Amino acid sequence: LAEQSPDVKVVILERGKDVLTKVRISGGGRCNVTHAEFLPSELVKNYPRGEKELLGPFHKFMTGDTIGWFEERGVALKIEEDGRMFPTSDTSESIINCFLKEAKEKGIEVKLNHAVQHIEKTEASWIVQTTKGTVIAKNLVVATGSNPKIWQMLQQLGHQLVPPVPSLFTFHNN
């Protein structure tokens, strides 16, 4: 978002004391970044759910784009025999550090320990109450993670949610 719209102020409200904790443990601590499949129609077949929802985004930003994005930022990726792609460093910290550096360069503000308590939509803005105060925003992007309280808040605002299934990352690999 910050890359596409540099004039927009982006604030991340993180419930926890640290960001990207699931990235840290993904792929056994190595962070399985993507899969070496370069056709969107083939890549989506490997997802046990979300095939329809992912096809459009994969046509806009695909495996090659992901590889290029990380390489432009100094993080080389490697392909393993089964097609999974990891940083050549074999540590998720390379990915985390890349994201944090990029966020800092783009002026993204990360507010830790800011658990969302209430979301309200007014005519002109969104009002988000957190454990540490109020944030008012013109636009709101919600990434709920595994927080059922947020799901309930979104439903109260009239959104329909697809029932969540616990997972860090799901990918069929034969």
Region locations from a protein language model:
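A generic structural signal for alpha->beta connector loops
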Residues: D7-K9, G74, G107, G158
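An accessory alpha-helical subdomain
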Residues: F61-E71, E81-K106
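Glycine-rich FAD pyrophosphate-binding loop
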Residues: A2-G28
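Hydrophobic anchor at the start of a short beta-strand
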Residues: V8-V10, L77, L140, L161
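A short alpha-helix-loop-beta-strand transition element characteristic
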Residues: V19-I25, E51, L55-M62, G74-M85, ...
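An anion/pyrophosphate-binding glycine-rich loop and adjacent beta-alpha core
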Residues: K17-V19, R24-I25, V33-P40, Q160-V162, ...
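Glycine-rich active-site loop/strand segments that organize a redox cofactor
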Residues: R30-I79
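Predominantly flavin-linked oxidoreductase catalytic cores and closely associated redox partners
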Residues: E93-N174
